[in-house]
Amino acid sequence: MRWSIIFTALLLTLCISPPAEELSREEYCSKVWRYDYECALNYILNDEEVQKVAAVAEKLKGVDCKDTAWKILEWEDENLVYDVEKASLPPPQIVVRGKEVEVYDTGRYIQTPSETIMLRKGICTDYAFLTLALLKYNGCKGYLVNVTFENDDVGHVAAAIAVNGTYFILDQHLPPFDPQGYFIKWLRDGKRIEKAEIIDNNTTIPLNLSIGYVASDRDAKSLESRIRQYFKGTGIREDPRLNGEKLPLGYREGYTLKLSLEMAEYYHPEFERQYAEHIYKLLEESIEGRFKAFNLHLSIKGDVMEIVLYLAR
């Protein structure tokens, strides 16, 4: 699972001559929605287009919208690839003359959600609109996020959901980010966000990038407790004597599995269950054979979550 990756994700930069008075916004958008993300919101996320992603969306419905958002990112991470070739194309140029609209350099168009699923690839706008469509199908309110970077003409877009007053950005891969975590993520990728805005219909809301959560030892213990319960649920017993050193009496073989995830700076307790399930899944996939007992330790060291699983048989 990739937790950090540098994207060359490009916002569709527009060069628009001021529309003539007789060209309404509706007429304009009907001609350029493939190249203008604000216009695309009404055209790509209508009921007809959203229904086309039903086969995938129904598989990603979670117990609530947080769970659905997590499952969507997980699916996108496993099934889609970033379209580097498309991202390298020049941005579209839109010219309006009276009621006539001409678009030049049309290769970097906005895909519909169903097209992105079919192609299995896209750029940031394609990921964002697919995420919004999958959320909408499952009855979850989604938002478009427009990002501007310092000293960079190239922008970026993503999706977001609101959970108990906090926006969480959904950007192609796990995990969901709170605003501060998203700011840190881009710093680590070599870019500094100058401004991020939530777009909700015709309303633009500045995103406060100082809002964030700092994971603590209490979070580590709570996650550890959840993961322990998952292992107990498989019938394997917990033995606190297992510590990777001398094998206690009653066992013939011991095994230690260590997992380091660069995700501590992005952790938020709103997604505790999803994090715990994800970590458990990663551990379970690495276990070969059957074991009688286990012990588990999870700690936070800087920006890293360290998980140590001791097994014995």
Swiss-Prot record:
Family annotation (InterPro entries): Papain-like_cys_pep_sf, Transglutaminase-like_domain
Pfam families, A to Z: DUF553
Family: Belongs to the UPF0252 family.
Name this protein carries in UniProt: UPF0252 protein AF_0384
Organism from which the protein derives: Archaeoglobus fulgidus (strain ATCC 49558 / DSM 4304 / JCM 9628 / NBRC 100126 / VC-16)
